[in-house]
Amino acid sequence: MKPSGLTFAFLVVFMMAIMYNSVQVTADADADAEAEALANALAEAGILDWGKKVMDWIKDKMGK
């Protein structure tokens, strides 16, 4: 029994969907790791606290 062209096309699309999904999951995990590393670096450098102080100073100067 010879598979039809439609069966072959379905298998190709199915394999492409599986490959795309696996690449997307890896990209999301990498992005999450990068975001966490950036947040940790900013927290360790004290930049977040500095930014809060600047915003408080601006609010005081604007009278809000």
From Swiss-Prot:
Modifications the protein undergoes after translation, according to the UniProt entry: Truncated sequences of this peptide have also been found in the venom. It is possible they have been cleaved in the venom.
Signal peptide: 1-27
Gene Ontology biological-process annotations: defense response to bacterium
Name the UniProt record assigns to this protein: U-poneritoxin(01)-Om1a
Domain of life: Eukaryota
GO cellular component: extracellular region
Biological source species: Odontomachus monticola
Subcellular localization(s) per the UniProt record: Secreted
Organism placement in taxonomy: Eukaryota, Metazoa, Ecdysozoa, Arthropoda, Hexapoda
Family (UniProt): Belongs to the formicidae venom precursor-01 superfamily.
Location of Methionine amide modifications: 62
Propiece residue ranges: 28-45
Entry keyword set: Amidation, Antibiotic, Antimicrobial, Secreted, Signal
Function: Antimicrobial peptide with activities against E.coli (MIC=1.3 uM), S.aureus (MIC=3.1 uM), and S.cerevisiae (MIC=50 uM). Also shows histamine-releasing activity (32.9% at 10 uM). Does not show hemolytic activity, even at 50 uM. It is a short peptide for which no alpha-helical region has been predicted.
Tissue expression remark: Expressed by the venom gland.
